[in-house]
Design a protein with these regions (language model features):
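Asp-box/WD-like beta-propeller blade repeats and closely related beta-sheet repeat scaffolds
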Residues: 115-163
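Beta-propeller and closely related beta-sheet repeat lectin domains
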Residues: 37-39, 94-97, 155-158, 202-205
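Blade-loop segments of beta-propeller domains
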Residues: 68, 75, 79-103, 111-113
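Short glycine/acidic-enriched loop and turn motifs that connect beta-strands
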Residues: 55-59, 115, 176, 220
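Residue-level detector of conserved catalytic or cofactor/ligand-binding positions
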Residues: 217-226
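Residue-level detector of Asp-centered blade-edge/turn motifs that repeat once per structural unit
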Residues: 43-46, 101-104, 161-164, 208-211
Length: 226
């Protein structure tokens, strides 16, 4: 009887300790132990890759962490090794999208200092560099940027490749256009996806499941976000 009481006491204390540990952790039981947003996760050759915005905790948009890609073989244990885009490590680096394999290379489309850029590498973990021009991120709408003219909401690129091989790029405020075969230029025809909600939106995710196209967007209102 005493052994049973002692075991019950130990079990209760272990559970209380676990609850306390979770309470002290501001991120809860996070899948990835980092302050990230705009995550895109994909499996490449048996390895899961998570590309995301790395925010400085409590800093908002004033700063961002270096671009790192978290990797895992079991979707439980995650790690990273250095930065995958060294020349952009000190820039404001957001929403890199998932890596797309095409033309024998891997492509990502991060928003750097407020503008979308196509970047290329031989491996999904990089190192990446701009697909066109020098790795310079301070001039808007140069030959290096994904868009060659000003476009409202031109941030947060998301790439979707349809069953026929056609690639599309989605970005802020519900914009979408075809991505050309070179994967670094955009078709001149740009459309806006019609939705019942008309507020400002960003951070699109687009995918196809069981024959149905699904679009997820982040909607912002003056007093709240969704």
């Amino acid at each position: 009887m005493q052994k049973q009481i002692f075991f019950s006491f130990v079990l209760v204390m272990m559970l209380l300790g676990k609850v306390k540990a979770q309470h002290n952790n501001p991120f809860g039981n996070a899948l990835i132990p980092d302050m990230i947003a705009d995550a895109s996760i994909q499996e490449i050759n048996g390895v899961f890759y998570c590309y995301a915005t790395t925010d400085g905790y409590g800093q908002g948009l004033k700063t961002s962490g270096p671009p790192v890609v978290w990797k895992s073989k079991d979707f439980v244990h995650w790690s990273f090794d250095g930065t995958y885009f060294p020349s952009a490590a000190k820039e404001k680096y957001w929403a890199p999208s998932k890596a797309i394999f095409a033309n024998g290379k891997y492509y990502i489309y991060p928003t750097i200092n407020g503008y979308m850029y196509p970047a290329v590498a031989d491996k999904p973990e990089g190192p990446f560099k701009l697909a066109r021009g020098k790795d310079e991120f301070y001039k808007p709408f140069t030959p290096s940027t994904l868009l060659q003219s000003k476009n409202p909401g031109g941030i947060d690129a998301e790439i979707f490749v349809d069953d026929d091989g056609q690639a599309y790029v989605f970005w802020g405020r519900r914009h979408v256009a075809k991505l050309n075969e070179d994967m670094i230029t955009v078709d001149s025809v740009v459309q806006v996806i019609s939705t019942p909600r008309k507020e400002y939106s960003e951070g699109p995710i687009f995918f196809k499941r069981k024959g149905i196209y699904l679009s997820l967007i982040h909607i912002s209102e003056p007093t709240r976000r969704r």
